[in-house]
């Protein structure tokens, strides 16, 4: 939790960190990823058979080794908008018998050479947990139940035996399942209304949890601020054993929201993720409201927020049907750092957050035929995933604020936009970690600093300008390491992310 006091530009900024004041446990799943059958994410990204850099499974070894550096706990699959016309059965069994299908989300052809079993093998090699999305477009409940049976079934039943026939004896025990993706959107095949969706999602959830009560089901929300979110939460978060339910466990475990931010101007770009912070706050209140209005007892586990698509993305600059390959700048990297600060600050409410996407498609990691490129946005992800874990701790920031235009325009009406965007954690290893983004394009900011102890390790992400980019043949943005004695004030460089780390007393 970070509190804030607005100062005039003439007053001296300060940051006070209180390591003894733990606020909430950080779910490591806020560092989750997302792979969709879109552009070069799967084919030519994580799966590239015939490339000398690929292993015997066709998986790019350099991609796997790089992603291991991020310690990704969960990866969402296989979509995304792709899911609305995807039928999982097409992607299992002998590859020479798998059909190619028209792909309507991104207007391509799906060969189905990479499917459930290939993805699960890749997850095992990466050391991550899967999160599957169900087809709420052209799919059926029978198809969804069959997929869960194929993945998790242990009995002598048809789809569990089909998995065994395809070479996997033990169940995959996939825990996380989404009840559709963005089904409210006009771009979706079989777009639906909130009334239709809420009824369908609840009925599907009942059946799925009868088949496997250990599943964690994620409701399809919008951006957290819409009437869709209120209605679906109101009609799907109900007491266990209510008249509408025969389940012994809550049917809905998480509520999904999506948001992408971007601006061609630096300051609107780096402050835009604060819209996500407000969306999380509103969604959390809507969850509370649904529980209160529906009489859900406090003994029943409260659903959390699954922010399972987020990133910096301009869909005009990087069009989805053309692969959505962004060339990220330092400004974008700092925006990603602010995004991650938001998730740390809101760790009480956020149970998962999936950056979209893991490889090539609006991604921090790009592939060529000969290797990989770590984009500017890689470095904040790397530092946060490595260090910003454990507990969110109390921090107070006093500084000036940016007073210009924001994207969206309503951000400054509901959120402060400080020059120093901050979050802080206490790790299980006893180290305090403080992430500070100086969003100013032209001004170093010296701030008083309270709470540091002993020698402080300093990690800085920066470049020559906010337009610095790693896609021009050289790495213009990376991480530099230094130390600080932890005394007095610290000067945070202009347009930078600084991570300070020390052993708690």
Swiss-Prot record:
InterPro entries associated with the record: Alpha-L-AF_C (IPR010720), Glyco_hydro_b (IPR013780), Glycoside_hydrolase_SF (IPR017853)
Pathway(s) it belongs to: Glycan metabolism; L-arabinan degradation
Enzyme class per UniProt: hydrolase
EC number of this enzyme: 3.2.1.55
GO process annotations (BP): arabinan catabolic process; L-arabinose metabolic process
GO cellular component, one term: extracellular region
Gene (UniProt): abfC
Catalytic reaction list: Hydrolysis of terminal non-reducing alpha-L-arabinofuranoside residues in alpha-L-arabinosides
Organism (species): Aspergillus clavatus (strain ATCC 1007 / CBS 513.65 / DSM 816 / NCTC 3887 / NRRL 1 / QM 1276 / 107)
Glycosylated residues, chain numbering: 152, 269, 438
Keywords: Carbohydrate metabolism, Glycoprotein, Glycosidase, Hydrolase, Polysaccharide degradation, Secreted, Signal
Major subcellular location class: secreted
GO molecular function, one term: alpha-L-arabinofuranosidase activity
Job description of the protein: Alpha-L-arabinofuranosidase involved in the degradation of arabinoxylan, a major component of plant hemicellulose. Acts only on small linear 1,5-alpha-linked L-arabinofuranosyl oligosaccharides.
Domain of life: Eukaryota
Cellular compartment(s): Secreted
Protein name in UniProt: Probable alpha-L-arabinofuranosidase C
Protein family: Belongs to the glycosyl hydrolase 51 family.
């Amino acid at each position: 939790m970070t509190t804030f006091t607005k100062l005039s530009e003439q007053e001296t900024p300060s940051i006070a960190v209180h390591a003894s004041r733990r606020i909430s446990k950080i779910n490591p799943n806020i560092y989750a990823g997302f792979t969709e059958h879109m552009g070069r994410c799967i084919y030519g990204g994580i799966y590239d058979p015939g490339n000398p850099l690929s292993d015997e499974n066709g998986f790019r070894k350099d991609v796997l080794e790089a992603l291991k550096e991020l310690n990704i706990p969960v990866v969402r699959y296989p979509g995304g908008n792709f899911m609305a016309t995807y039928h999982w059965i097409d992607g299992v069994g002998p590859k020479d018998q798998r059909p190619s299908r028209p792909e309507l989300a991104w207007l391509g052809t799906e060969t189905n050479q990479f499917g459930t079993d290939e993805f699960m093998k890749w997850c095992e090699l990466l050391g991550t947990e899967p999160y599957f999305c169900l087809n709420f477009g052209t799919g059926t409940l029978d198809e969804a139940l069959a997929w869960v049976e194929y993945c998790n079934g242990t009995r002598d039943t048809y789809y569990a035996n089909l998995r065994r026939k395809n070479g996997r004896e033990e169940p995959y025990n996939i825990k996380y399942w989404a009840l559709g993706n963005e089904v409210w959107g006009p771009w979706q095949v079989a777009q639906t209304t909130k009334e239709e969706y809420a009824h369908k999602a609840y009925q599907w959830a009942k059946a799925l949890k009868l088949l496997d009560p250990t599943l964690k089901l994620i409701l399809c929300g919008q951006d957290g601020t819409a009437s869709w979110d209120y209605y679906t939460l109101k009609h799907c978060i109900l007491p266990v054993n209510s008249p509408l339910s025969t389940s012994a466990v809550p049917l809905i475990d998480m509520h999904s929201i999506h948001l992408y931010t971007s601006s061609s101007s630096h300051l609107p770009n780096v402050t835009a993720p604060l819209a996500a912070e407000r969306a999380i706050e509103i969604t959390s209140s809507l969850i509370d409201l649904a529980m209160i209005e529906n009489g859900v007892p406090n003994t029943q586990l409260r659903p959390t927020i699954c922010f399972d698509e987020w990133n910096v993305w301009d869909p005009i600059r990087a069009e989805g049907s053309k692969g959505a390959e962004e060339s990220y700048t330092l400004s974008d990297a700092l925006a990603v750092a602010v995004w991650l600060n938001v998730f740390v600050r809101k760790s009480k409410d956020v149970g998962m957050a999936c950056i979209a996407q893991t490889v090539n498609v609006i991604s921090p990691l790009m592939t060529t035929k000969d290797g990989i490129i770590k984009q500017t946005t890689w470095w904040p992800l790397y530092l946060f995933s490595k260090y910003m874990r454990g507990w969110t701790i109390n921090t107070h920031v006093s500084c000036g604020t940016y007073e210009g235009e924001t994207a969206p325009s309503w951000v400054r009406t509901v959120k402060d936009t400080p020059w120093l965007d901050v979050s802080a954690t206490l790790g299980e290893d006893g180290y305090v970690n403080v992430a500070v983004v100086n969003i100013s394009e032209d001004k170093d900011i010296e701030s008083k600093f309270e709470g540091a102890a002993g020698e402080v390790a300093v990690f800085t992400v920066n470049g020559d300008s906010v337009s610095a980019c790693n896609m021009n043949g050289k790495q213009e943005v990376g991480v530099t390491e230094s130390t600080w004695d932890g005394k007095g004030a610290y000067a945070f460089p202009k347009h930078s992310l600084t991570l300070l780390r020390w052993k708690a007393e």
